[in-house]
């Protein structure tokens, strides 16, 4: 990486941040300007993810772990297996598996925390589906807004990757803008951050008080889980 998006401070904890996606598992250690990855896919189990990360980072010295998963997570508990991955994510003891203090969070929430600049922020992650999180004066509130009704289906069915493939980029962008406008009207955030792998496909003007995020924010979010109160 040419630019570091996660901080290094004297006495800062050495946090290994793991961002689990449908195609890759990515790992970053704060203080090292390097990102490592390996392929995931629909058969990847929770244990295989941990084993892969441990093998990938044998030469890294860290004291804590943050894991972002594409699944609902409440109070550190994974509610169901990720849709685009394998099984065994809900029953895995992540802290025991890594052998370090470990925090597990929804992947959109982790990226949201890394994008947060105070106040009331709505984060929308455009990728395979629609990730969503609000942060209210420092308190993280993961959401599943993608499942709410929109037009003739749900928000996710229009602005997720399958929606983009069906609509084409031009109509998909219009659906994204309308999604931002509707959710902003209902949730009243101070500002909106749009992240995820498809955020870069949004060219042109964005709605007021809306900006594009950076996928590296997930790693900053993983670090912040151990140094900030949220």
Spans of model-derived segments:
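Short glycine-rich, Thr/Ser-proximal phosphate-binding strand/loop in the N-terminal lobe
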Residues: 2-51, 136-166
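Residue-level signal for inorganic ion chemistry
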Residues: 27, 67, 194-196, 222
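Short secondary-structure boundary segments
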Residues: 69, 126-128, 196-197
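Short glycine-aspartate micro-motif
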Residues: 15-19, 62-66, 121-125, 193
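Glycine-rich phosphate-binding loop plus the immediately following alpha-helix
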Residues: 25, 89-92, 96-111, 120, ...
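Glycine-rich phosphate-binding loop and adjoining helix at the ATP-binding site
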Residues: 37, 41-54, 58-66, 71-120, ...
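Glycine-rich phosphate-binding loops at beta-strand->alpha-helix junctions
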Residues: 24, 183-215
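Short beta-strand scaffold segments in enzyme catalytic cores
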Residues: 25-29, 71, 113, 130-136
């Amino acid at each position: 990486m040419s630019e570091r998006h996660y901080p290094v401070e004297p006495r800062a904890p050495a946090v290994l941040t793991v961002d689990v996606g449908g195609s890759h598992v990515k790992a970053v250690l704060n203080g090292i300007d390097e990102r490592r990855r390996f392929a995931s896919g629909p058969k990847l189990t929770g244990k295989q993810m941990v084993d892969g990360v441990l093998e990938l980072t044998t030469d890294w010295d860290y004291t804590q772990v943050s894991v972002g998963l594409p699944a609902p997570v409440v109070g550190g508990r994974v509610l169901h297996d990720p849709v685009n991955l394998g099984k065994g994510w809900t029953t895995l003891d992540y802290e025991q598996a890594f052998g370090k203090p470990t925090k597990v969070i929804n992947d959109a929430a982790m990226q949201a925390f890394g994008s947060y600049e105070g106040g009331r922020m709505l984060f929308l992650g455009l990728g395979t589906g629609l990730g969503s999180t609000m942060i209210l004066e420092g308190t993280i509130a993961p959401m599943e807004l993608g499942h709410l009704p929109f037009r003739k289906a749900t928000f996710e069915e229009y602005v997720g990757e399958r929606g983009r493939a069906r609509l084409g980029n031009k109509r998909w962008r219009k659906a994204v803008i309308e999604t931002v406008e509707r959710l902003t009207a209902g949730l009243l955030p101070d500002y909106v951050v749009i992240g995820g792998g498809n955020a870069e496909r949004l060219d042109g003007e964005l709605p007021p008080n809306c900006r594009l995020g950076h996928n590296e924010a997930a790693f900053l979010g993983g670090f912040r889980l151990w140094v900030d109160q949220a």
